[in-house]
C-alpha cells in the first residue's frame, strides 16, 4: 500500500489506514488504523466498526475491534481490527467478550432492572 487511505468515522473523527494485511491462512484481514479526533472523545467501537465494514465491504458482525489505544490528552487513537470472511472462522479465533464488546445487547443485570 503506497498511500494511506482515509476513512470517515464520524462527524468529528477520521482515520488513516496504516497497515492492511490479508491473512489468507486464517481467512481475515488485519488492519491497523490511526483515528484523529482532536477536541472530541475517542470514537465508539460501534462507529469504528461501521466505518471499517463500509470501507472493506464486509458485514458489521464480521468486524472485530481488538483494541483501541488513546494517549492521555491526545486526540489521536490507534486501533487494531480484524475483519473475517466467515462467522464460524471468527468464532474460532476471537474471544466472545471482544466480539460482543461495543454491541448494544442487554446484559442479565439490565434485564432484571
Swiss-Prot record:
Signal peptide residues on this chain, from the entry's feature table: none
One GO location term (cellular component): ribonucleoprotein complex
One of the GO biological process terms: translation
One Gene Ontology molecular-function label: structural constituent of ribosome
Chain ranges passing through the membrane: none
Disulfide bonds: none
Family in the record: Belongs to the eukaryotic ribosomal protein eS24 family.
UniProt cross-references to HAMAP family, sorted A to Z: Ribosomal_eS24
UniProt name for this protein: Small ribosomal subunit protein eS24
Natural source organism: Metallosphaera sedula (strain ATCC 51363 / DSM 5348 / JCM 9185 / NBRC 15509 / TH2)
Gene of this entry: rps24e
